């Protein structure tokens, strides 16, 4: 028979433990905090540890600025809470899009994904250098393999997002209406030259296009028209036009130098920048305050309106997918380990 003293002792321990937890006197270990479920998507859990792994760089900065007890500072805790919320929202939406991509059978092939991943990593290394790239990857909580997996999921999610808006179009009438109602937006901010350019991923494609223009097989304008919607569809090559200011141009140095060597109407040989290979055509010179004509900004306007429509469509679809996949988000759990002022 169990003694009465043992029963009473057990009961008291239970009451005291309940009270302590209720008053936050018993603090969770970091391991327990990391295992806290902050969302579920289609039955798959997202833990707080997964969220925080994306904030390693932020935590390092906070620790350097505020010391080891930075999470005890209510203002810092509030900032971290906001960061966690943003990361969680991104993770939830990424998982939803990956599910939808698989459901719609639009996941790119392994070969295509690997090619995209290698190209993206190569671009990062060219922009930030080998050491800068490694530090950036580590600050986001990844190693080389997990970063590649992250990029893979991003490309799969992009496929689902693009598929959701594939039938959305912007008419010339809508573009003209936007131009007429927002003319101030298309005033030149500083004197400069209008640059129209074709951007290719590699030198071979750029050289082939240049040779075809020079031989008369095609024209720069024909290629510009052919490629000007590619940016919207996340395809290459792309075609863009914009005014490059005479001074303090926030454009790649090689691009500016290539443009300055051209007279109006002339076309450059392929020029390499960190973004790829450009064939540039020099346009007219515009004074500050001049109005850019509709035909020179039409593709920009279509891009603006398409992005607006895409965003609205994706938001609507996302709301429905969250219901279909029984998505649960526990925002209150994001406060774990933080001292949030009431």
Swiss-Prot record:
It is found in: Cell membrane. GO terms for cellular component: plasma membrane. Its main location: membrane. Coiled coil: none annotated. One of its GO terms (molecular function) is peptidyl-prolyl cis-trans isomerase activity. It catalyses: [protein]-peptidylproline (omega=180) = [protein]-peptidylproline (omega=0). A lipid is attached at residue 23 (S-diacylglycerol cysteine). Keywords: Cell membrane, Isomerase, Lipoprotein, Membrane, Palmitate, Rotamase, Signal. Residues 190-284 form the PpiC domain. Its EC number is 5.2.1.8. One of its GO terms (biological process) is protein folding. A lipid is attached at residue 23 (N-palmitoyl cysteine). InterPro entries: Foldase_PrsA, PPIase_dom_sf, PPIase_PpiC, PrsA_foldase, Trigger_fact/SurA_dom_sf. Residues 1-22 form the signal peptide. It is a lipid-anchor. It comes from the Bacteria. HAMAP family: Foldase_PrsA (MF_01145). PANTHER family: FOLDASE PROTEIN PRSA, PEPTIDYLPROLYL ISOMERASE. Plays a major role in protein secretion by helping the post-translocational extracellular folding of several secreted proteins. Belongs to the PrsA family. This is Foldase protein PrsA. It comes from Clostridium perfringens (strain SM101 / Type A). The lineage of its organism: Bacteria, Bacillati, Bacillota, Clostridia, Eubacteriales. The gene is prsA.
């Amino acid at each position: 028979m169990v003694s009465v003293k043992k029963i009473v002792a057990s009961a008291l321990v239970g009451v005291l433990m309940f009270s302590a937890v209720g008053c936050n006197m018993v603090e969770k270990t970091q391991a327990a905090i990391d295992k806290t479920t902050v969302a579920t998507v289609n039955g798959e859990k997202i833990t707080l540890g997964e969220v925080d792994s994306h904030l390693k760089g932020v935590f390092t900065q906070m620790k350097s600025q505020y010391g080891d007890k930075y999470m005890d500072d209510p203002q810092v805790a509030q900032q971290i809470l906001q960061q966690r919320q943003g990361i969680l929202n991104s993770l939830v939406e990424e998982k939803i899009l990956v599910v939808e991509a698989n459901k719609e059978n639009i996941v790119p092939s392994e070969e295509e994904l690997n090619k995209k991943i290698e190209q993206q990593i190569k671009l990062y290394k060219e922009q930030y250098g080998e050491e800068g790239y490694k530090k950036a990857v580590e600050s986001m909580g990844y190693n080389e393999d997990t970063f590649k997996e992250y990029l893979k999921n991003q490309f799969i999610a992009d496929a689902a997002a693009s598929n959701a808006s594939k039938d959305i179009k912007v008419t010339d009438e809508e573009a003209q209406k936007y131009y007429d109602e927002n003319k101030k937006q298309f005033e030149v901010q500083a004197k400069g030259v209008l640059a129209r350019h074709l951007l290719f991923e590699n030198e071979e494609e750029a050289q082939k296009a240049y040779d075809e223009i020079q031989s008369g097989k095609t024209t720069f304008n024909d290629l510009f028209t052919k490629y000007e919607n590619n940016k919207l569809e996340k395809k290459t090559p792309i075609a863009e036009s914009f005014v490059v200011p005479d001074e303090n141009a926030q454009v790649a140095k090689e691009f500016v130098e290539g443009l300055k060597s051209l007279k109006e109407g002339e076309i450059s040989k392929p020029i390499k920048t960190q973004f790829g290979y450009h064939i540039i055509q020099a346009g007219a010179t515009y004074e500050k305050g001049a109005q850019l004509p509709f035909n020179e900004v039409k593709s920009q306007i279509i891009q603006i309106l398409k992005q607006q429509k895409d965003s609205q469509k994706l938001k609507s679809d996302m709301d429905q997918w969250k219901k279909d996949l029984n998505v649960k988000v526990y925002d209150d759990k994001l406060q774990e380990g933080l001292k949030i002022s009431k």
